[in-house]
Amino acid sequence: MQIKAEEISQIIKDQIGDYETSVDLNETGTVISVGDGIARIYGVQNCMAMELLEFPSGIMGLALNLEEDNVGCAVLGSVQGIKEGDIVKRTGKIAEVPVGPAMSGRVVDGLGKPIDGQGPINSDLTSKIEVVAPGVIARKGVHEPCYTGAKAVDAMTPVGRGQRELVIGDRQIGKTALCVDAIIAQKNTDVHCIYVAVGQKKSTVALVVEALRKHGAMEYTTVVAACASDPAPMQYIAPFAGCSMGEYYRDNGQHALIIYDDLSKQAVAYRELSLLLRRPPGREAYPGDIFFNHSRLLERASKVNDELGAGSLTALPIIETQAGDVSAFIPTNVISITDGQVYLEPNLFFSGVRPAVNIGLSVSRVGGSAQCKAMKQVAGTLRLDLAQYRELAAFAAFGSDLDVSTQAKLTRGERLVEILKQPQYQPLPMEKQVTILYAGSTGHLDSLPIGSLAAYEADLYDYLEANEPSVFTDLVAEQAFTDGIKEKLNKALTSFGETFKAIKGLK
């Protein structure tokens, strides 16, 4: 068989013509050691800080230490399938999470991947987990209230939109309960909520999600869960991921509320990471930049100015203390970063005062700016009455014969403490809060036994809704106690008080 030269040259030309010159160019590195959730990688020369790196098994890593001859990478998953010599690819992307309305009602991990079994999240919007906080010029003073639904908090230590209010206290005294109630209280408002669970048991997170779902709050809430069994890097980045989700609403002229539950466990996760990366330890073995870690997270909560849409991101970080020690390293750090704190005390909790807010140690640095006029009108006398009550109660314990004015102050104080108690999952709107506080501070409760006040409060709301609904609607419209509202309310309180005493057989 004779092969013609022309045919051969034609075949070669065809092959050259069909040849695709695409080059798959990847910058890769090699794993030189792996263990305890940290991989050391050689060769990724142009790697950026906080860049995502991809391991052969599809697991992602986060570049934290950029050293001369290697990169210290936190593995965001199990290290079981990673071994020395594995090829690692650069993604060229800084760690980011999906954001936007599609996240509402979902439970996700620290990278924004769904873990609730409800299918993938269809969101084209993403945001970097590390974003610089708005500058001074971009901000506006906090001036709108963000109601938590808890009478003790909204009256004494009010939270405004764009504020950072720390919730601090020992374990198991209602910190999470207070914050979950704050989420439920946003039900009929335009506030989107993000709940970040760090280092919690999965069963605890499931209970919170179930409570939110039961009260119709999951519709506007995103839960970011980095549980106790998740790797330390996931627990470290979860609050930043949740913050990015909240910032989407703030930057689009909307309002968001984020709960960090809790930052003590995030600090422990960051300490673990830092020590494994051989960073020098400082006080209590925390790294030197632990303060910066918390401040750059909490500074992202802000109220932005009108030119940027007047949106806000309000933060309620939680810190767990050991035996009430608020002078430990992490509590003092976060107290100094935030705009006030709500201090929950075990003694109050176990004596039946729930929420167990210690009014003396709790403070809001925004104060009256975050309250409507109606709340200011009742809260001013309330704080004074309670302060006098606490002072007199200490002395009254030693003597039995008290003069009439002292006895009156003690009577008033006992009733005010009682009406500040509130059951879990029952946050109150502003108009109901100011109504019962007004009744307490004007003496309408002084003649009632303490044990009957819970029933009095519940029946009072029903009575007003049935017989004087204009009191609530006027309070919402005016946001203040006008002479007309006071007159109507005083009349209703007197009438209801007589009816209540008659029904309960009280004198």
UniProtKB/Swiss-Prot annotation:
Record's keyword terms, sorted: ATP synthesis, ATP-binding, Cell inner membrane, Cell membrane, CF(1), Hydrogen ion transport, Ion transport, Membrane, Nucleotide-binding, Translocase, Transport
Location relative to the cell: Cell inner membrane
GO cellular component: plasma membrane; proton-transporting ATP synthase complex
Signal peptide start-end: none
Keyword Transmembrane helix: no
Reaction catalyzed: ATP + H2O + 4 H(+)(in) = ADP + phosphate + 5 H(+)(out)
The enzyme's E.C. designation: 7.1.2.2
The keyword Cell membrane is assigned to this record: yes
GO molecular function, one term: ATP binding
Binding locations of ATP: 169-176
Subunit structure: F-type ATPases have 2 components, CF(1) - the catalytic core - and CF(0) - the membrane proton channel. CF(1) has five subunits: alpha(3), beta(3), gamma(1), delta(1), epsilon(1). CF(0) has three main subunits: a(1), b(2) and c(9-12). The alpha and beta chains form an alternating ring which encloses part of the gamma chain. CF(1) is attached to CF(0) by a central stalk formed by the gamma and epsilon chains, while a peripheral stalk is formed by the delta and b chains.
Stored PANTHER family: ATP SYNTHASE SUBUNIT ALPHA, MITOCHONDRIAL
Name of the protein described by the UniProt record: ATP synthase subunit alpha
Organism placement in taxonomy: Bacteria, Pseudomonadati, Thermodesulfobacteriota, Desulfobulbia, Desulfobulbales
Gene giving rise to this polypeptide: atpA
